[in-house]
Regions:
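Membrane-anchoring hydrophobic helices of lipid-metabolizing enzymes
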Residues: 1-129, 143
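Polar-ligand-bearing catalytic/cofactor-coordination segments
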Residues: 4, 118-120, 137, 146, ...
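Internal hydrophobic scaffold segments of catalytic domains
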Residues: 46, 185-214
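Catalytic core of membrane glycerolipid acyltransferases/transacylases, capturing the structured
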Residues: 70-98, 105, 125-187
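Conserved beta-strand elements of the Class I
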Residues: 130-132, 267, 320
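Accessory terminal regions of nucleic-acid processing enzymes
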Residues: 306-350
């Protein structure tokens, strides 16, 4: 990824031009999309054109707001002060919530929640939290961020790969707020950044980490299990083979977060209902999804967490098995083995 001084003038300018063009041409684009959907008898073109108009309208609004905040912060000099941090969190909350509402409406997704009272109390109370979630399906990240921002009024610090910074709104907000934007080619730097962000969580801060490192697919699961075997981690490979709906977690990122904030409670989250529609092609083919996104959360108290790193890996796998069992009990997703007749592998982030 090019440095910000090179990247942002290009991406911000391009996004501004595209956003303005999409909004100006939106009546024509929507009319053409409606015609195409009527001719083909398939709604995808109209649905995604509507979604694109919403997306670029929000992108334009956020870029203008980011520019205004930069000027108000004396050219960025006051950007790290509490006032401007709160203003950026409010901007992020508004952007994510509006997009989420339109996204779930257009794709016909219904939301259902299961959660323990302990997890709810921890999220509602003050105190830093670590939030480890399964990663599968389109947009689960934004759904979780919206929940943390809007329902629980938390300030999420998200761990994600730097490739998403190609979106200038994500790029600007992610670097103005304490998110962990990672170059995954440098494992030590990734762990250090996760540890740093976890250590700096405030009273309403929550670190959102996907220990699997990528969306679940049967092929990714096979590859991950093969990689565990090749690296001599046979016990973890054997445990991963007994989990059909999740990728084996990569412990390094989770352990870095625990090192950074050893006193923080951990909330584990799983969700079901979106199946394997994790990539653009699958989403296009299955739209409208007309599904129920069911999520569940559990609190893992500090007192029940081992201090030894090796024991923490076992603890993490124990929880991941619990998430897998919950997904299996929902009955809405086909086990990985059924896709290819095998019980093997899939990858992740640090």
């Amino acid at each position: 990824m090019p440095p910000a001084s090179v990247r942002r003038p290009v991406t911000v300018t391009l996004w501004l031009l595209v956003s303005i063009a999409v909004l100006v041409l939106s009546p024509v684009l929507l009319a053409l999309a409606a015609l195409a959907s009527a001719v083909t008898g398939r709604p995808q073109m109209l649905i995604f054109t509507r979604l694109a108009v919403v997306y670029f309208a929000l992108e334009l609004a956020v870029l203008i707001a980011c520019g205004g905040l930069w000027l108000a912060a004396c050219g960025g000099l006051l950007m790290k002060t509490p006032l401007f941090q709160r203003l950026h969190v409010a901007l992020l909350r508004q952007f994510v919530h509006v997009f989420t509402l339109r996204w779930i409406a257009l794709l016909e997704i219904e939301m259902a929640e299961e959660e323990t009272s302990a997890a709810s109390r921890a999220l509602e109370a003050d105190g830093p939290l670590l939030f480890f979630s399964r990663h599968a399906g389109p947009g689960d990240t934004i759904l979780l961020i919206d929940r943390l921002l809007t329902r629980y009024e938390r300030s999420p610090s998200v761990v994600f790969k730097e490739s998403v910074a190609i979106d200038p709104c994500v790029d600007l907000i992610a670097h103005r707020l304490p998110h962990a934007v990672l170059d995954t080619a440098d494992k030590e730097a990734c762990e250090a950044r996760i540890e740093e962000v976890a250590a700096g969580l405030g009273e309403r801060g929550v670190l959102l980490l996907f220990p699997e490192g990528g969306n679940f697919t049967a092929e990714r699961r096979r590859r991950a299990i093969r990689k565990l075997r090749r690296s001599g981690r046979r016990r973890e490979a054997a445990r991963a083979e007994r989990m059909d709906h999740v990728l084996p977690p990569r412990p390094s990122g989770a352990l870095a977060a625990l090192r950074g904030n050893p006193g923080a409670e951990v909330v584990f989250a799983a969700h079901s209902g979106l199946g394997l529609a994790a990539f653009p092609r699958e989403v296009w083919q299955q739209t409208p999804l007309t599904r129920t996104f069911t999520s569940a959360m559990w609190l893992a108290p500090v007192a029940e967490r081992p201090a030894d790193p090796e024991a923490q890996v076992v603890w993490l796998y124990d929880w991941w098995k619990r998430l897998d069992d919950w997904v299996d009990a929902q009955g809405s997703e086909t086990p990985a083995a059924a896709h290819d007749g095998s019980t093997t592998a899939g990858p992740s982030q640090p």
